[in-house]
Amino acid sequence: PLVRLLTDGMNAYVTADGYVFAAPRASSLYVPVVTGSYRPPFPASYVGSVREHIDLRLGEIDERIAELEREKYPLYRREMENDRNISALRRMRIKRQWWRLEGSREFDERVDALREKKAALRRTYRYRARVIREEIERIAGLQEAERRKQKKLEKSYEDFMKLLTFVESVENDDFWRSEVVQIAAHTTPSGALEVELTPRSGRFTILFGRLEEVERKFGKLERFYRRGLPSIGWNEYRTIDIRYNDQVVCKK
């Protein structure tokens, strides 16, 4: 295994290619440990490939989207029927019945009656069209919510794999493998994954932030280790923040 997860109720080992298995009770494997409130994109009891779990969940969501699409079919048929009724309503006309020697008064009465009938039908069809359209849009909204779930799931998986890559990069560097004692991962309110590092040297916590531009951040931190901390003092600050471009922000 590459790492042990002790986050948000998890206690599992993960390999570099994303295979999860439960931590054995009788023994421990000496690998880096990730703690914190971070919630991986799989349940605590899961054993297996994380990618397979994600694909299964995405497939379930696809089925739900397709199921919702089928709910639209009768609404589309009702909408087409309503459109035909509206077209037929526009074609309704009154012709004078010359063969019955219809007078102007009788004709005008029939015209008024037809106008009232058309007005009532127009209101009915417009109301029906609005109700049908609102129901279609409601279902479309549910589909969009499912698609957002898919995007969130993919982003969660992407962050998880970034975390594994990050741990691997620490392990592959002799200096940082010795210096980083603990990695704490958490999810920000915006949904981004950020990490904090507990180093062997000093009494501070390193706010690493998002797992982006990892090499640049480690390079910046290493320069600060060599040029800044020896003169400032290793126990002067409580946090060292390297989340910002070309800056190292220290707080007591």
Question: What residues fall within each predicted segment?
Answer:
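Charged, solvent-exposed interaction patches on well-folded alpha/beta domains
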Residues: 1-252
